Amino acid sequence: IYKDKNYGWPISSDGNMYVDGYNDGDEYSLSQRNYKDHEDMGFENPIFSFIPSIGITEIVELEDEFIETWKNNFLVGSLNSKHLYRIKFDKEFKKINYYEKIFVGERIRDLKYDSRNSQVIMALEDSGSLGILKKKSIKINLF
């Protein structure tokens, strides 16, 4: 995601359109809103889309000291799928080289990387717990 780029929502979508009761007064008619080609509408094309939507909550970049094999990876929190997603881009950030679903079992409301302690902290919605993904164990602890 780049600053000042328009990815088209809610006019253009790779997934389902949710237009019931939606009226923002823009110049696009409802018939134009389900248009799949972002570029033809003047929007930036995403390099990857979660279809169906996973309900992205937070995206964090993992710094070098977390785990060598996860160096410069991103973690994506999800409300819909109850998974954490690990994503590795190519060097130019033009395509995804690797993507992994990590089962958490709860909706991830928020996600933060604690570089001082080399851990990822997740606010879990269903139980109100904190989930911690630690550098050494790579397992999720619920508190």
Residue ranges and their predicted role:
Residues I1-N97, S129, K135-I138:
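Beta-propeller domain segments
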Residues V76, F103, M122:
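Small/polar loops that bind or transfer phosphate-bearing groups
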Residues K94-S115:
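Conserved blade-ending motifs and adjacent loop-strand segments that build the rim/top face
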Residues K112-F143:
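Blade-level signature of beta-propeller repeat domains, shared across WD40, Kelch, NHL, RCC1
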